Amino acid sequence: MTRIKRGYIARRRRTKLRLFASSFRGAHSRLTRTMTQQRIRALVSAHRDRGKRKRDFRRLWITRINAVIHETGVFYSYNRFIHNLYKKQLLLNRKILAQIALLNRSCLYTISNEIKN
């Protein structure tokens, strides 16, 4: 009876795994089992941090807006600013407001003066 050699599917899967894990350090880029485990961990971390990145950027925008607003007046806080924006029905999100705060502070000053009571 002739010998039947194994197929290429497992080798192709491991090659793909090696390409993914080639930048990992130590045994994590050399041994198949640890490569598999590290790949799972990397994908879990990537999934988790995609959500975390959204929260981090929102926090950064809020901090930037708050810093610029505190320069205008001592008693004018961020939450009051956002509340007045919604009351006046100005559709500016936090990302745009943070960019305005960085690049064009005078424009943000005029916006805050317009929406003050």
UniProtKB/Swiss-Prot annotation:
Coiled coil: none annotated. Belongs to the bacterial ribosomal protein bL20 family. GO terms for biological process: ribosomal large subunit assembly; translation. Its main location: plastid. GO terms for cellular component: chloroplast; ribonucleoprotein complex; ribosome. It comes from Lepidium virginicum. Signal peptide: none annotated. GO terms for molecular function: rRNA binding; structural constituent of ribosome. Binds directly to 23S ribosomal RNA and is necessary for the in vitro assembly process of the 50S ribosomal subunit. It is not involved in the protein synthesizing functions of that subunit. InterPro entries: Ribosomal_bL20, RIBOSOMAL_L20_CS, Ribosomal_protein_bL20_C. NCBIfam families: rplT_bact. Keywords: Chloroplast, Plastid, Ribonucleoprotein, Ribosomal protein, RNA-binding, rRNA-binding. Transmembrane segments: none annotated. HAMAP family: Ribosomal_bL20. This is Large ribosomal subunit protein bL20c. CDD domains: Ribosomal_L20. It comes from the Eukaryota.
